[in-house]
């Protein structure tokens, strides 16, 4: 992976919200248990190098959802809370770009590369990654700073979070994003 200029690369933190803790407490199994720790490391690195950080939160339009703004689950996880000056984008669909000013903000900042982390790999992270690629951004999707949950298939078969995560990364690889590890990003951010 080539170097990443801190002036042209933004970290996009997608939906790292407490609702996912509620899912785990209800017995849903996830992969990448250290993903949030990796996100915290990336946040520290981007902030230290004064590279832009943008936070995205999902606000459901369904009052019964864990992501409803008045629910506990809407809140961001404490360890990834935004710092002063870091924008927070609130979205209502899977894409961080639809119905938001994310693209405009990135273009106004002169950003041409985005590093995407968060949850879940096969929903909002995947949709945001595809759209960022389609909009012409060079996307780095951080495989160890994203996660998903087990899912039941249409015929009742179980797909593990690891299987879903791996297939999603395979689908996005090359056409929409470069799949990278957090350590790779931290090693390349700001190097010449």
Model-derived features: where do they sit?
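Active-site-adjacent betaalpha module
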Residues: 1-10, 37-44, 48-49, 61, ...
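N-terminal nucleotide-binding beta1-loop-alpha1 segment
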Residues: 10-16
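Generic enzyme active-site microenvironment
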Residues: 13, 55-56, 142
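Short beta-to-alpha linker loops that shape the active-site pocket of alpha/beta-hydrolase fold enzymes
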Residues: 17, 59
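Short acidic/His/Gly/Ser-rich catalytic and metal-binding motifs that mark active-site loops
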Residues: 19-22, 149-151
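Acidic/histidine-rich helix-loop elements
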Residues: 21-33, 156-158
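Charged, well-structured alpha/beta interaction segments
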Residues: 28, 36-39, 52-54
